[in-house]
Amino acid sequence: MAQEAPRWLEPSPFEWKDQTGLAVKTAIPGAKPTVAIDVASVTKSYGDKPVINGLSFTVAAGECFGLLGPNGAGKSTITRMILGMTTPGTGEITVLGVPVPSRARLARMRIGVVPQFDNLDLEFTVRENLLVFGRYFRMSTREIEAVIPSLLEFARLENKADARVSDLSGGMKRRLTLARALINDPQLLILDEPTTGLDPHARHLIWERLRSLLARGKTILLTTHIMEEAERLCDRLCVLEAGHKIAEGRPHMLIDEKIGCQVIEIYGGDPHELSALVSPHARHIEVSGETVFCYASDPEQVRVQLDGRAGVRFLQRPPNLEDVFLRLTGRELKD
């Protein structure tokens, strides 16, 4: 007999509003137009410093939506407003069908959060961390214990249930933080830099786990500085700079729209001389330190100019989301 899927892995019911304005629930993502997050013309200032400027975007139920931007772009501020922890100056935010911040407590009961830095109880065991966290959602001990085995299996921590968190590796702690965020069977997951600082093996395991959640109908709001992560996971994304939305769309569409040609990275010589050498055959050129980024529709012509030059090395590759990000926000360091 097939084992029944754990409750927290089943597609969650989503709310939508019909023409009468009444809230209606559907357990089938996509059966009706659904919106998990609606941010409409939101502003926020601290003193006389604006940090969010008329920002609008929607996150459809069941999709992974990315928020990208350099430090200080407003990602943390808008995330805090979505959670009801910060009040917008103007504009409206609706999360899972309820207005925020006025009914943020209700919305948060259906949200799981993975913060940028793990805030686990280090002296507790893995199991104890899950037990304690579940009580914040008014779950009984019996309810929590019923889902712990599935959560540990999901996080691949079945053999670490009684281990102290302080003895876990960084990747294990991150997986436990993700499992903990699922304790309340959330409809929406908010992930802040979920794989920063992890080695490639741990990062890819987290990505695989997140894709399995999306396949189950969960909604994910993701902030990250890892462009490969955003390109792999996000259905759509929004790029912020100084509180403004400067681009929005599907990753591959943004790559085609903003770049749309091969990229050749050139280094090992004077960047200004190299730029002048290849510029007749380039659609666009950027210089960062000692590296020249040449965007070319006909890379063969660029290679002809570079072949045989002493000390000069180059790498031709397809464009990626990092190229888009740096094209939009610039290659200068932003603190």
Curated annotation (Swiss-Prot):
Membrane-crossing segments per the record: none
Pfam families: ABC_tran (PF00005)
Signal sequence interval, chain numbering: none
Record's bilayer topology term: Peripheral membrane protein
Enzyme Commission number, as recorded: 7.6.2.-
Family: Belongs to the ABC transporter superfamily. Lipooligosaccharide exporter (TC 3.A.1.102) family.
Record InterPro entries: AAA+_ATPase (IPR003593), ABC_transporter-like_ATP-bd (IPR003439), ABC_transporter-like_CS (IPR017871), ABC_transporter_ATP-binding (IPR050763), ABC_transptNodI (IPR005978), P-loop_NTPase (IPR027417)
Cellular compartments annotated: Cell inner membrane
One annotated Gene Ontology cellular component of this protein: plasma membrane
Enzyme kind, highest EC tier: translocase
Keywords attached to this entry: ATP-binding, Cell inner membrane, Cell membrane, Membrane, Nodulation, Nucleotide-binding, Plasmid, Translocase, Transport
SUPFAM superfamilies recorded: P-loop containing nucleoside triphosphate hydrolases
Protein's UniProt name: Nod factor export ATP-binding protein I
Quaternary structure and interacting proteins, as annotated: The complex is composed of two ATP-binding proteins (NodI) and two transmembrane proteins (NodJ).
Function: Part of the ABC transporter complex NodIJ involved in the export of the nodulation factors (Nod factors), the bacterial signal molecules that induce symbiosis and subsequent nodulation induction. Nod factors are LCO (lipo-chitin oligosaccharide), a modified beta-1,4-linked N-acetylglucosamine oligosaccharide. This subunit is responsible for energy coupling to the transport system.
Residues the record lists as binding ATP: 69-76
Stretches assigned to the ABC transporter domain: 37-267
PROSITE patterns for the chain: ABC_TRANSPORTER_1, ABC_TRANSPORTER_2, NODI
Highest taxon of the lineage: Bacteria
Family annotation (Gene3D superfamilies): P-loop containing nucleotide triphosphate hydrolases
